Amino acid sequence: QRQMCIRDSSSSVDLTSNEPWIVARNTAVILLLYGCGLRISEALSIKYNDMPLTNNLKVKGKGDKFRIIPILQIARESVENYLKLLPFTLDGNDNIFRGVRGGSLNPRSIQLIMKLLREKLGLASNATPHSLRHSFATHLLTSGADLRSIQELLGHTSLSTTQIYTSVDSAHLMDVYSKTHPKAKSKNSLN
């Protein structure tokens, strides 16, 4: 499976509509899924009360537990751009992401957008909105983040759940081992 990166996700979502606000919405949602590791339900439940965004985002996760996560500047700017273009008026407790008729955006819409992205980018059939969350976790781990921090960012109660998300290749594990284990640094000497 080819993992998506921020470049793929931000430059490719415009294939789904000619309406600028819909293009902006799709871009913002995809960037939140990948750039913040959000579940689709978490992204779609962001409230107008939470605006304007700062460098952090308060997310209501599973079990109605809240967590604070950092938000990438590109994701924040995408949400702000979407809100400027949105043709509907929002009240404080409204979800910010809206469907074509102004109601709350249905998760199925995002799944369909991902289907179009898969076709355009030649991604594997298992490239789904949820796989963006997996890519987020895997990219953090391969860039040096520790599992415990990734667990907090994803909102997992169990570290074993986080481990499932972080598909680590054996070459990366051996590299980390050889660079960090004191005896591995000294040419596998046990002295």
Where are these regions (language model features)?
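Conserved catalytic core of the tyrosine transesterase superfamily
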Residues: 3, 7-191
